[in-house]
Design a protein with these regions (language model features):
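Short, contiguous alpha-helical
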Residues: 5, 9-23, 28-66, 98-155
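Helix-adjacent hinge/juxtasegments
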Residues: 53-93
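Short, contiguous pre-domain boundary segments
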Residues: 1-2
Length: 155
């Protein structure tokens, strides 16, 4: 497999791992927390849109489509399903219609940034996430679902 594609797949797995930690044990009403700009559910919807856009751009359709947020559990599911579809495309031999570097520097980097934003909002909402050493985390390409391995070195 192409090294660039494989690295982008590892990046998607990293995104899935970090987001799953951010969403894990979030209060039921966290998606509607307000007081810091967009609500978490709106941010998560945007993140799902970014991943769909990355997938579609890689397939040759770079048109942007913003969606209305779904309820929190469905929005989380939509994100991870979009991530799995994009990962499957990268794992295939289908030629990409966009440079891997651009897919990383645009939608994927943006989604990683928003993952950190959601983690900060968890703290603002009074429900901080537990820290861990992400360098030691058991992250592997293709592991892009919401179910992730347990932390190797939690704080």
């Amino acid at each position: 497999m192409d090294e660039k594609r494989e690295f982008l797949r590892h990046t998607l797995a990293t995104l899935a791992y970090r987001l799953s930690r951010t969403l894990q044990n979030a209060p039921i009403d966290f998606g509607d927390f307000s007081g810091a700009g967009r609500r978490p559910v709106e941010i998560l919807a945007h993140m799902g849109d970014l991943i769909v856009w990355a997938h579609n751009t890689a397939m040759g359709d770079p048109s942007w489509k913003a969606t209305r947020p779904l309820p929190w559990p469905q929005e989380s599911q939509r994100f991870f399903e979009a991530l799995a579809a994009f990962d499957a495309l990268l794992a295939s031999h289908t030629p990409l219609m966009a440079p891997v570097e651009n897919l990383f520097q645009g939608p994927i980097a943006d989604a990683l940034t928003h993952t950190g934003q959601l983690a900060m909002l968890r703290r603002f909402a009074g429900s901080p996430t537990r820290g861990e050493n992400f360098y030691a985390a058991a992250i592997a390409a293709g592991q892009v679902g919401s179910a992730q391995p347990a932390p190797v070195k939690p704080f």
